[in-house]
Design a protein with these regions (language model features):
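Histidine-acidic metal/acid-base catalytic patches
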Residues: 1-28, 54, 58-61, 153-168, ...
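Active-site beta-loop-alpha junctions enriched in small/polar residues
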Residues: 9-13, 35-37, 69-72, 108-110, ...
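A generic secondary-structure micro-motif detector
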Residues: 10, 42-43, 81, 120, ...
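Active-site acidic/histidine proton-transfer and metal-coordination neighborhood
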Residues: 16-22, 56-59, 76-169, 178-180, ...
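Short, well-structured secondary-structure segments
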Residues: 30-36, 63-66, 103-105
């Protein structure tokens, strides 16, 4: 088995990069999947700010593994695709400064109540053009399964990764649970296309997020298969308590189920608990 590299969405510990660094260091993380910095979304920071963040991370021996971008978390019917392509190029430039190998992205929200199949060709066309925009940059676009987007279940994720060959996959067990998808069946279909995993778990009964290994995501079984298949990189995504940027991750009208069965006195405590849950799964 190869060495395991563990990263985190440390904005769930602190909105400030200094607090994120301390959270990663005390939990033995290698670095960040960077999503929000000092109250700003990663795509909104200046290039100079990115250089400053890179220096702070370098000084503590930490790296940025991926940009946890929101690209593709817009409606498929929105007339904003030129802006999406511009965001890809901006993300690539930030990734180069920060030293990130990957950009996490999504496959567009489908209108509520509509059959996703109606939008199949439009989604694939957009994702293909996004992949073309990043071609030759040295940065990989990684599609994450997410509630409400075209790629919310295993079958459509497989279709995306098969038809847009330049993309690789991010496997999020909790998001599959929240879509009613059996995660092991999803893994069997997608495993060969997965570049890294988000360590996050949830319950079928109420969609609430729980520590990894405590839910219905079969995280232990899938993690074992991922590592045996040559996988190396994991991102801890706690979602165990409300944090500053949570509302920016949700579709309008939706609310994440966090902080239910498991309660923590602070965002730092919830972050530490999520890291500990992964350590227990890894043995």
């Amino acid at each position: 088995m190869k060495d395991i590299h563990i990263y985190a969405f440390a904005d769930e510990a602190s909105p400030m990069v200094d607090g994120q660094i301390e959270a990663m260091v005390r939990n033995g993380m290698q670095g960040l999947e960077i999503r929000n910095v000092d109250g700003e979304n990663i795509l909104d920071i200046s290039l100079q700010k990115a250089r400053e963040v890179r220096k702070k991370l370098d000084d503590r021996g930490l790296k940025v593994w991926a940009l946890g971008s929101p690209i593709g978390k817009t409606g498929i019917e929105e007339d904003n695709f030129p802006k999406v392509l511009s965001s890809i190029m901006n993300a690539v430039e930030l990734a180069h400064i920060l030293g990130a190998e990957n950009i996490r992205m999504f496959s567009f929200y489908i209108p509520a109540g509509q059959d996703p199949a109606r939008y199949q060709s439009q989604v694939i066309d957009r994702l293909s053009r996004m992949a073309e925009a990043a071609e030759g940059s040295g940065v990989t676009l990684c599609h994450e399964n997410e509630k409400g987007i075209y790629g919310d279940n295993a079958a459509r994720c497989e279709e995306i990764l098969r038809k847009v060959g330049a993309l690789q996959g991010v496997f999020d067990p909790a998001n599959f649970v929240q879509c009613g998808q059996d995660t092991w069946e999803a893994w069997k279909l997608l495993g060969s296309k997965i570049k890294y995993m988000h360590i996050k778990d949830a319950l079928f009964k109420d969609n609430s997020v729980v520590p990894a290994g405590k839910g219905d995501g079969q995280v232990d079984k899938i993690l074992k298969a991922f590592l045996e298949n040559g996988g190396e990189c994991l991102t801890v995504e706690p979602h165990l308590t409300v944090f500053d940027a949570l509302k920016t991750l949700e579709r309008e009208g939706e609310k994440s189920r966090v902080g239910g069965a498991y309660a923590y006195p602070s965002s730092d405590a919830a972050f530490d608990a999520a890291c500990q849950a992964l350590r227990e799964l890894l043995g």
